[in-house]
């Protein structure tokens, strides 16, 4: 079943197929300048009794678990992945951007080093929709759970070869993040326009990102694994799901996968 073209919305109602109450699916962006929640999101949060994000961000062990998984396996370091010239370039770049010498951070997976620089892509104090959603859940005294464990999420990054991860980092170093800034701006514009189709096209066409090259690992496989959990939670109680917007559109996106299972998934406009 091919995905129908999606209306411009970030909030979707899941109903039918034996569900007693509707659940809601909201596409987040993990970093933005303004993460205020629209009225229709607040209403959906009022009508649900559980918040489920990609990860259970209320888990007190989250940081510790995350720290365990940020290092490359088998004692590998960036020095093993690049030539001398690129190593020096990366050294200067990391010192400038995160204030640490490469000898200290060289054993961290390149993906995480790239992620440490994400806040620099925005000229503002970074806000996150996940944090705003958690605040509301706490006010409503509701539980916050996750669709995957930290371990499962870390395995995703383990499945992408370190060579590909370091290629992304090198590109950022070579153009001083100009490409990243431009791409992220485009992504924010599409997100603010609630244009999931546009986001999907951008992800599919951006040959520079290892996320595109490894879309199956980053998005598709995870979406597939989440469906059973989304069903399980929704059957028990009205649930509000908040996941990265890139997971929603496309043939293998969460919206189409739920429709294939027989659920009605409609845009809340």
Model-based region annotation:
Residues 14-24, 29-210, 214:
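Structured, acidic catalytic/metal-binding patches in enzyme active sites
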Residues 7, 37, 129-130, 223-226:
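Amphipathic coiled-coil/heptad-repeat helices and related helical stalk/stem segments
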Residues 4-6, 17-18, 45, 233:
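A generic structural signal for short, solvent-exposed coil/turn residues
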Residues 1-7, 12:
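Bacterial Sec-dependent N-terminal signal peptides
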């Amino acid at each position: 079943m091919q995905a129908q073209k999606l209306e411009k919305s970030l909030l979707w109602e899941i109903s039918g197929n034996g569900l007693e109450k509707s659940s809601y699916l909201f596409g987040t962006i993990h970093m933005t300048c303004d993460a205020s929640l629209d009225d229709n999101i607040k209403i959906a949060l009022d009508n649900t009794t559980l918040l489920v994000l990609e990860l259970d961000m209320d888990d007190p062990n989250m940081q510790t678990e995350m720290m365990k998984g940020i290092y490359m396996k088998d004692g590998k370091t960036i020095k093993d992945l690049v030539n001398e010239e690129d190593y020096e370039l990366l050294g200067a770049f990391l010192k400038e951007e995160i204030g640490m010498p490469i000898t200290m951070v060289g054993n961290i997976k390149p993906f995480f080093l790239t992620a440490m620089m994400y806040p620099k892509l925005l000229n503002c104090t970074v806000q996150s929709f996940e944090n705003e959603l958690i605040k509301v859940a706490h006010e409503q005294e509701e539980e916050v759970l996750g669709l995957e464990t930290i371990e499962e999420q870390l395995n995703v990054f383990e499945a992408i070869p370190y060579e590909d991860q370091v290629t992304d980092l090198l590109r950022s170093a070579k153009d001083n993040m100009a490409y990243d800034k431009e791409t992220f701006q485009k992504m924010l514009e599409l997100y603010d326009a609630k244009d999931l189709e546009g986001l999907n096209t951008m992800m599919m066409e951006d040959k520079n990102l290892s996320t595109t090259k490894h879309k199956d690992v980053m998005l598709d496989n995870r979406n597939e694994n989440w469906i059973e959990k989304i069903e399980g939670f929704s059957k028990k109680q009205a649930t509000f799901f908040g996941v990265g917007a890139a997971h929603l559109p496309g043939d293998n996106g969460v919206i189409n996968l739920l429709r294939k299972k027989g659920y009605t998934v409609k845009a809340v406009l």
